[in-house]
């Protein structure tokens, strides 16, 4: 029985859906002519709250994409998704790019630019509003969206961080703080 490494690799990543957002070609001029290199921006997600982003660079596009996928697997984050949307409004920042992410009601859909929409859909967010502010460079916007999603907290997580878990319940029951 023969084994095919490519099939094994595809089986490994089958839990994640991938989306290639952007391929950039750069060139360097040498005495004999130009040499091209490629950079690929890839998003991986399971549509269930886990999403990762990677940028791979290589002399050929397929190699750059594979590198980007490997980097995206290493940079996975978990996004708190409540009823198909994010728990609260947040602004993600990277360089001169800022992205405003807002929760939306059921049936709204993902109203966003191409980069925030792709990341939100692969994270499992079905209702969200977004606005890109400042620079709209795809790489910087992607990093800004990830910054925003990484800093999201549910109400329960905030209570635990602040140590208010028991006090909030007492206040809701009509007790003293």
From Swiss-Prot:
Transmembrane segments: none
PROSITE patterns noted in UniProt: RIBOSOMAL_S5, S5_DSRBD
An annotated GO BP: translation
InterPro entries xref list: Ribosomal_Su5_D2-typ_SF (IPR020568), Ribosomal_uS5 (IPR000851), Ribosomal_uS5_bac-type (IPR005712), Ribosomal_uS5_C (IPR005324), Ribosomal_uS5_N (IPR013810), Ribosomal_uS5_N_CS (IPR018192), Ribsml_uS5_D2-typ_fold_subgr (IPR014721)
GO molecular-function terms, A-Z: rRNA binding; structural constituent of ribosome
Coiled-coil intervals, chain numbering: none
GO cellular component: small ribosomal subunit
Protein keywords: Ribonucleoprotein, Ribosomal protein, RNA-binding, rRNA-binding
S5 DRBM domain segment(s): 16-79
Free-text domain note: The N-terminal domain interacts with the head of the 30S subunit; the C-terminal domain interacts with the body and contacts protein S4. The interaction surface between S4 and S5 is involved in control of translational fidelity.
Its biological purpose: With S4 and S12 plays an important role in translational accuracy.
Family: Belongs to the universal ribosomal protein uS5 family.
Subunit structure: Part of the 30S ribosomal subunit. Contacts proteins S4 and S8.
The protein's name: Small ribosomal subunit protein uS5
Source species of the chain: Deinococcus geothermalis (strain DSM 11300 / CIP 105573 / AG-3a)
